[in-house]
Design a protein with these regions (language model features):
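Alpha/beta catalytic barrel-like cores
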Residues: 1-85, 134, 148-195, 205-230
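Conserved, mostly hydrophobic/aromatic
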Residues: 67, 89, 93, 111, ...
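Active-site-proximal loop/short-helix segments
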Residues: 68-77, 104-123
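Short, amphipathic alpha-helical segments
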Residues: 83, 87-91, 119
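Secondary-structure boundary elements
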Residues: 88-107, 127-137, 226-230
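N-terminal active-site wall of soluble small-molecule enzyme domains
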Residues: 118-150
Length: 230
């Protein structure tokens, strides 16, 4: 069974059932976040575990599932103290994983501006990931010194392949899996077994409409078929 296509998380939808049904169409279902219902990452972290789709999503069993949470460096850039950031994140992840039935759970920490944070994110991430039985990953849609991620304890690195070429860095891969955030097939420079495909970022911004969900999924599925032969 192919396990390539998933999503960053946020969707331009409001209906919970529609969002969960959409997620289930992906190779790797993901926990939908609906900013129009208050699921923006700086909002849900105020009330950890308060996500619109969580209850409906947990009705399903998964072979592999992807969940996500705002990362500690991002919260600290927004004014949170280190201990409070980690506590809120862990409360949120615990609320998500409690009762979630999955053979494998991929957890991405969303760190949009990690390159500008100036914090020791490796220690922060380790403190979080060590508390859960998950496959650890991070999503960074901005630019940074990617060697820092290649030299981290992450197993999956998610990035905007439509803007950045991480293959040119000396530490490229270092045994890591890559989640390629693409707009077109040509954005992929070095797809290997175990890698993932997503859009460059989430679809929770005003530029995306409801009809874009199906269009973008079909595009990702087509690219996955072309590069995998499945």
């Amino acid at each position: 069974m192919r396990k390539i296509v998933t999503q960053v998380g946020s969707l331009p939808l409001e209906d919970v059932n529609e969002a969960v049904a959409y997620s289930l169409k992906h190779d790797i279902p993901f926990l939908p976040e609906l900013p129009k219902r208050g699921d923006a990452m700086m909002e849900y972290i105020k009330k950890p575990g308060n996500l619109s789709c969580l209850k409906e999503f947990k009705k399903h069993k998964f072979e592999t599932v992807k969940i996500q949470c705002v990362g500690p460096a991002t919260l600290m850039l927004s004014g949170f103290k280190e201990n409070e950031a980690i506590q809120r994140i862990c409360e949120h992840i615990t609320a998500i994983t409690d009762g979630l039935e999955a053979g494998e759970t991929i957890l991405f920490l969303d760190e949009p501006a990690l390159g500008q944070s100036g914090v020791n994110f490796r220690e922060l991430h380790r403190a979080i990931f060590s508390a859960y039985k998950v496959t650890p990953g991070a999503h960074v849609c901005g630019n940074m010194d990617w060697d820092l991620l290649f030299d981290s304890g992450l197993e999956i690195i998610s990035f905007d392949a439509s803007q950045f070429d991480i293959t040119k860095y000396s530490g490229y891969r270092s045994g890591k899996r890559i989640s390629w955030g693409v707009k077109r097939k040509e954005d992929i420079k070095d797809f290997r077994e175990g890698d993932l495909l997503t859009l460059p970022c989430g679809m929770g911004t005003p530029m995306y409409k409801r009809e874009d969900c199906g269009t973008n999924l079909n595009k990702l599925l087509k690219i996955a078929e072309e590069i995998s032969g499945k």
